[in-house]
């Protein structure tokens, strides 16, 4: 049985991928790591700063790791505020993981993003192979990361694989500084019976994906026959092409008194306007059977059910369309 390390395990993807990996491969075979200190007695978690090369190599060697899911990164909006930190975390961390993988013979997963594209890229049906000229430091690190993974694959034989993920919607992880976090915030506001003020314009269309589809795609790619993978690294995957207004309308079908306002933040709006509205995922479908299960309606039902289970049922005033006197901005 493979021995797995997840870096950035407490982040947006890691919070759901780590338990999914443990369900598939057994908890004892999956080591989680992040910057937070380990809790006493937790043998399946270790503190790790991925910018420290010796620490990365030591953990991989000591735990006899076969596969690294390298998720540690600063997300788009945070990265724009801290570009030097973003380069250090996103690039040095990946380099250290790839170097350790070269030394110890590990397989590596690296999550790329729609941020790897820019305003000169075709925005609808963005092809697998196309121009990549991002305008954010986050996007620059994703393109550079794709190329670095390709280099380690061709030069050193490291089995590095990756996906270009759309904006991700998670019922588990709180918003973490991403440009598409508005969707998560919107669902959470609805469950809390709050009016929501969206930081993107109402008609900003972007490719999005529900996290259960993303974690399944990640695991399926890593199990795929390498002989069938034309690209290995940075496959386009897609979930749904939606706008904030469309998500709000779908939520309102379940919570009639939910309402959203739209006051675009210049920084995040500019980032969103440079990203694809939809991705062409035909290569992923053909090479390893990528098939998302959640459209907007299914995602909305599942998100609200999960968030309600965590926080309590909807208020009757929402369920029956009666305005909530305590509504405010989320």
Where are the regions that the model predicts?
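C-terminal substrate-binding subdomain of Rossmann-fold SDR/epimerase-dehydratase oxidoreductases
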Residues: 199-201, 207-321, 325-329
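A conserved pocket-lining segment of Rossmann-fold NAD(P)-dependent short-chain dehydrogenase/reductase
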Residues: 80, 131, 165-175, 185-209, ...
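Conserved Rossmann-fold NAD(P)-dependent oxidoreductase catalytic core, especially the SDR/UDP-sugar
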Residues: 95-137
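NAD(P)-cofactor binding segment of oxidoreductase domains
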Residues: 62, 81-108
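N-terminal Rossmann NAD(P)H-binding glycine-rich loop of SDR-like oxidoreductase domains
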Residues: 4-23
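Conserved beta-loop-beta element that borders a ligand/cofactor-binding pocket
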Residues: 113, 147-172
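NAD(P)H-binding glycine-rich loop region in Rossmannoid oxidoreductase-like domains
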Residues: 50-89
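Glycine/proline-rich active-site loop of Rossmann-fold NAD(P)-dependent oxidoreductases
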Residues: 143, 156, 169-184, 211-212, ...
């Amino acid at each position: 049985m493979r021995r797995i390390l997840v870096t950035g395990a407490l982040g947006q993807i890691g919070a759901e991928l780590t338990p999914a990996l443990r369900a598939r491969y057994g908890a004892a075979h999956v080591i989680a790591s992040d910057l937070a200190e380990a809790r006493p007695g937790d043998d399946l978690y270790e503190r790790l700063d991925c910018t420290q090369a010796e620490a990365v190599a030591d953990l991989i060697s000591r735990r006899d790791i076969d596969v690294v899911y390298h998720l540690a990164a600063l997300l788009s909006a945070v990265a724009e505020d801290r570009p030097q930190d973003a380069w250090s975390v996103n690039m040095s961390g990946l380099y250290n993981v790839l170097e350790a993988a070269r030394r110890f013979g590990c397989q590596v997963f690296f999550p790329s993003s729609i941020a790897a594209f820019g305003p000169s890229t075709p925005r609808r049906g963005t092809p697998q192979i196309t121009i990549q000229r991002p305008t954010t430091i986050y996007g620059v690190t994703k393109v550079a990361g794709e190329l670095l993974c390709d280099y380690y694959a061709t030069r050193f034989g490291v089995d590095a694989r990756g996906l270009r993920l759309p904006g991700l919607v998670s019922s588990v992880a709180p918003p973490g500084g991403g440009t598409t976090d508005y969707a998560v915030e919107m669902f959470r506001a609805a469950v809390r019976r709050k009016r929501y003020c969206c930081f993107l314009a109402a008609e900003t269309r972007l490719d999005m994906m529900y996290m259960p589809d993303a974690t399944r795609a990640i695991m399926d790619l890593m199990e795929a026959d390498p002989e069938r993978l034309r690209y290995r690294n940075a496959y386009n995957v897609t979930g749904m092409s939606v706008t904030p207004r469309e998500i709000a309308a779908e939520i309102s079908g379940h919570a009639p008194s939910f309402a959203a306002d739209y006051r675009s933040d210049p920084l995040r709006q500019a980032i969103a306007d440079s990203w694809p509205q939809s991705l062409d995922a035909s290569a992923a479908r053909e090479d390893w059977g990528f098939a998302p299960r959640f459209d907007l309606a299914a995602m909305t039902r599942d998100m609200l059910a999960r968030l309600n289970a965590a926080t309590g049922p909807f208020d009757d005033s929402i369920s029956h369309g009666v305005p909530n006197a305590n509504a405010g901005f989320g």
